[in-house]
């Protein structure tokens, strides 16, 4: 072995060794316990970031540890390769998205290999490969046949200049990101998946089928699915269209979870697209203009929640079903046509949004719920106004005096008797719109015939292959203009010339089942095969909390659809979920001459702190652009690493300077996996120094008689026949005590304490000085072998190199499959124990006694101790108190 630790040489040699033996290729083996661990597949954006390094190292540590414990472990990797960034890059660089994507995949794969990850690359998938997305199309056709997929109109963001649909993130302050044009809302047809058919099961299994998921994520899923128990009822009206027919049969339906407040309704609000709104707008230019204004707002519930609530009176009146009083109908920009019936009742006294709306537009407020001891203020909202648990109905006729539950039942019964309403369960969850008016995605397998309309592509003609030579120019859908995509296409029914569907699928489709394709990635005849039966469900899934809702919910839904189609047998795809914390770094900025913020790399800045250590200012250490060193900049605190904030750390730079093992070790040691990690350059240096200490100790150990390295000195047996000295026993006690804790921490995936345990081991080994005492060499060799195996999942390269170089592999085989060290319970037994010595209740020192000493022996040892004799001045104790294993107290 080379004397100096040179990480790049060590890591290249280890990786070459693993590559030569095809170390990570995994096959199904029914004789072994299986474990499937997977990180969420990355988008090939160009380079790995530190969040990737952390995620994949967590996965790698888990799989290596389990492999040493006899498991058949699968750790695959793939690429979530479709999506908008590739189109944006194509616009910027003038290259096809396919070229940009595959170049990025090649580079990021090389980075992963440099990290030493135990990935089975034979199972690699890229979602932009026709052999993969063929099965997206195949399952879509199956869902279409089963009625799970269907077509309807959808509201989208439309850029009138580029003549294209924009994703929500491409709309900035109501304008297109490229053209600056005011974005319009348009209704266009698209395909949806009936995820709502699975709402009850998706919700029910959150608590029963996801035992290894964080409670936070389960709560987020429950809230997103959003089961609501309430009443759906109608306000009647006599509003007729131009032909004289009643609009919606003279009924405007709403849903409420607070039917106990029905007598407090003072207005209703409808969505801008509601039939009553459109009817009223025909003779009302101001209302028509307001409806057009609403079309430039957000289309999602989240966007509507944050935007200013606006409304306009339609002039229409509906009738309250219980009071028969007239109720004004307003158009509200906060009401979505896609939610419920596109209309809501307004109860300003008991809903905070309605209260603000009523105060803004001078609408009546009627209190119908009272909490004992509270005073209602019509000018200021108070949280108790919406308290249904403590509230009692007032000003509500026959319902007055009722609790929430009583009033719900009574109101529902009354409305049902009138034929105007009924109790109903509704869901916040909406069907999944999968059509995207983009180029770089899975083509939807539909052909549009002038005679037969939308016709499914026959299965034998799959996949419908996406053209690879498109370079989007930002105007319109490239697939509309790509004649090669439509060339020779005929209707499967009548054979006449037709055109393909030019919408592509939402990229969440790609990521909803890739983990099943890993199980059988080369299968050309089936979407999934026998591999899925062996590996699924996945035992451990690892990814960011940002995917807690959509990706995980869609993956659960997709799995249930595949189950119902007989493709898999599992109900839930992921048994356990770990959401790793973000990697954070300092953020520094300064307003430029144009008013925009410029961000500075933290390594170019130094902080100015007060006496408490609080950062009070920051300045440039070096010149940056036209700014000289010493220029003051603003310190914005700690935030997530990102390109936009210029506070990222390039893993490649870290690996080239310190090695992959240091990068891996640092990201694991600094914080528990689920917690955020605050970047600290000094701690990175500390991780490197620790590995150098391990290497140096290995070099030192190589100078002693390594013939002693055999099965009896590597922790595999209890070493009963060796006469260990007192010092060697103490070393073995320390090593095996830490090993017991480290093993427990590995099982809990608390990798930060695993690393701290390894540091305790190297301290114990370095501090051992009795190298010539009985059994000393054996204890050292055993201890270092245990340390290498404990470190191996975190820092596999250095552990492999030392394991091979010191001869451990000759007995126990390659570290890949070496058995995990077993705790020697005999080593944990102590010959002597140290007890605290107190005199008159005050700690004065300690005594060492035999581990099996009796109470009398302990008393005598304490009385005979030098400390007691010195302080007692010849006096004898009046009383001796012994607490076994802890202390002895002499009362004088």
Swiss-Prot record:
It is found in: Cytoplasm. NCBIfam families: leuS_bact. GO terms for biological process: leucyl-tRNA aminoacylation. ATP binds at residue 643. One of its GO terms (molecular function) is ATP binding. A motif ('KMSKS' region) lies at residues 640-644. Pfam families: Anticodon_1 (PF08264), tRNA-synt_1 (PF00133), tRNA-synt_1_2 (PF13603), tRNA-synt_1g (PF09334). It catalyses: tRNA(Leu) + L-leucine + ATP = L-leucyl-tRNA(Leu) + AMP + diphosphate. One of its GO terms (cellular component) is cytosol. A motif ('HIGH' region) lies at residues 42-52. PANTHER family: LEUCINE--TRNA LIGASE, MITOCHONDRIAL, LEUCYL-TRNA SYNTHETASE. Keywords: Aminoacyl-tRNA synthetase, ATP-binding, Cytoplasm, Ligase, Nucleotide-binding, Protein biosynthesis. Belongs to the class-I aminoacyl-tRNA synthetase family. This is Leucine--tRNA ligase. Its EC number is 6.1.1.4.
């Amino acid at each position: 072995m080379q004397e100096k630790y040179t990480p790049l040489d060590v890591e290249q040699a280890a990786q070459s060794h693993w590559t030569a033996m095809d170390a990570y290729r995994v096959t199904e083996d029914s004789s072994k316990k299986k474990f499937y661990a997977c990180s969420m597949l990355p988008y090939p954006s160009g380079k790995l970031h530190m969040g990737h390094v952390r995620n994949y190292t967590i996965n790698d540590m888990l799989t290596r540890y389990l492999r040493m414990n006899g498991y058949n472990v699968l750790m695959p990797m793939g690429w979530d390769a479709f999506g908008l960034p590739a189109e944006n890059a194509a616009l910027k660089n003038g290259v096809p998205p396919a070229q940009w994507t595959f170049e990025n995949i090649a580079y990021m794969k090389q980075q992963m290999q440099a990290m030493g990850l135990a990935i089975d690359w034979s199972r690699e998938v890229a979602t932009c490969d026709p052999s993969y997305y063929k099965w997206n199309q195949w399952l879509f056709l199956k869902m279409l046949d089963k009625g799970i997929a269907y077509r309807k109109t959808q509201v989208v963001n439309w850029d009138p200049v580029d003549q294209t649909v924009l994703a929500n993130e491409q709309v900035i302050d109501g304008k297109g990101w490229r053209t600056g044009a005011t974005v319009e809302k348009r209704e266009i047809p698209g395909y949806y998946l009936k995820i709502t058919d699975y709402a009850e099961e998706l919700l029910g299994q959150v608590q029963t089928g996801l035992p290894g998921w964080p409670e936070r994520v389960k709560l987020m899923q429950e809230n997103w699915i959003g089961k609501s128990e309430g009443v759906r009822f109608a306000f009647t009206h006599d509003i007729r269209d131009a032909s004289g027919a009643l609009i919606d049969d003279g009924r405007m339906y709403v849903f409420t979870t607070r039917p106990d407040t029905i007598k407090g309704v003072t207005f209703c609000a409808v969505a801008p697209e509601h039939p009553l709104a459109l009817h009223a707008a025909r003779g009302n230019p101001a209302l028509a203009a307001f409806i057009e204004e609403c079309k430039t707002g957000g289309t999602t519930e989240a966007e509507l929640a944050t935007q200013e609530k606006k409304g306009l009176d339609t002039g229409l009146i509906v009738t309250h079903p219980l009071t028969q009083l007239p109720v004004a109908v307003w158009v509200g920009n906060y009401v979505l046509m896609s939610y419920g019936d596109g209309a809501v009742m307004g109860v300003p006294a008991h809903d905070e949004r309605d209260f603000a709306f009523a105060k803004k537009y001078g609408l009546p407020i009627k209190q119908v719920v009272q909490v004992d001891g509270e005073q209602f203020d019509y000018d200021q909202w108070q949280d108790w106004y919406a308290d249904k648990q403590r509230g009692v109905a007032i000003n509500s006729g026959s319902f007055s005096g009722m609790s929430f539950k009583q009033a719900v039942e009574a109101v529902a019964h009354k409305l049902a008797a009138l034929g105007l309403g009924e109790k109903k369960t509704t869901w916040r969850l909406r069907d999944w719109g999968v059509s995207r008016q983009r180029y770089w995605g899975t083509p939807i397998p539909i052909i549009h015939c002038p005679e037969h309309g939308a016709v499914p592509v026959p299965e034998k003609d799959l996949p419908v292959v996406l053209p690879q030579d498109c370079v989007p120019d930002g105007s319109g859908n490239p697939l509309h203009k790509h004649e090669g995509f439509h060339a020779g296409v005929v209707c499967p029914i009548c054979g006449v010339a037709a055109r393909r569907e030019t919408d592509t699928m939402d990229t969440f489709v790609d990521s909803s089942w890739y983990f099943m394709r890993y199980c059988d990635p080369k299968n050309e005849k089936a979407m999934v095969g026998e591999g899925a039966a062996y590996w699924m469900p996945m035992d451990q899934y690892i990814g960011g909390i940002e995917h807690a809702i959509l990706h995980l919910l869609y993956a659960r839904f997709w799995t249930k659809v595949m189950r119902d189609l007989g493709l898999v047998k599992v109900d839930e795809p992921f048994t356990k979920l770990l959401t790793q914390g973000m990697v954070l770094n300092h953020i520094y900025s300064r307003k430029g001459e144009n008013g925009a913020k410029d961000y500075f790399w933290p390594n170019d800045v130094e902080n100015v702190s007060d006496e408490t250590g609080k950062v009070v200012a920051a300045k440039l250490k070096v010149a940056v652009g036209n700014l000289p060193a010493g220029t003051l900049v603003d310190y914005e605190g700690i935030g997530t690493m990102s390109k936009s904030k210029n506070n990222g750390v390039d893993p490649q730079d870290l690996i080239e300077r310190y090695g992959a093992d240091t990068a891996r070790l640092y990201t694991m040691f600094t914080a528990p996996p689920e917690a955020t990690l605050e970047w600290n350059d000094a701690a990175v240096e500390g991780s490197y120094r620790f590995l150098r200490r391990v290497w140096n100790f290995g070099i030192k150990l190589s100078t002693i008689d390594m013939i002693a390295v055999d099965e009896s000195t590597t922790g595999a047996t209890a070493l009963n026949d060796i006469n260990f000295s007192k010092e060697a026993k103490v070393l073995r006690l320390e090593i095996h005590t830490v090993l017991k804790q480290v093993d427990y921490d590995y099982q809990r995936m608390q990798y930060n304490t695993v690393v701290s345990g390894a540091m305790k081991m190297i301290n114990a080994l370095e501090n051992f000085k009795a190298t010539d005492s009985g059994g000393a060499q054996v204890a050292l060799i055993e201890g270092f072998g245990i340390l290498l195996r404990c470190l191996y999942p975190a820092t596999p390269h250095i552990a492999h190199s030392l394991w091979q170089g010191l001869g451990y592999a000759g007995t126990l085989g390659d570290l890949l499959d070496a058995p995990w060290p077993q705790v020697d319970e005999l080593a944990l037994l102590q010959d002597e124990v140290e007890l605290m010595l107190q005199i008159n209740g005050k700690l004065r020192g300690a005594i060492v006694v035999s581990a099996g000493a009796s109470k009398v022996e302990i008393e005598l040892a304490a009385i005979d101790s030098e400390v007691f004799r010195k302080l007692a001045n010849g006096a004898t104790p009046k009383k001796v108190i012994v607490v076994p294993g802890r202390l002895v107290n002499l009362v004088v």
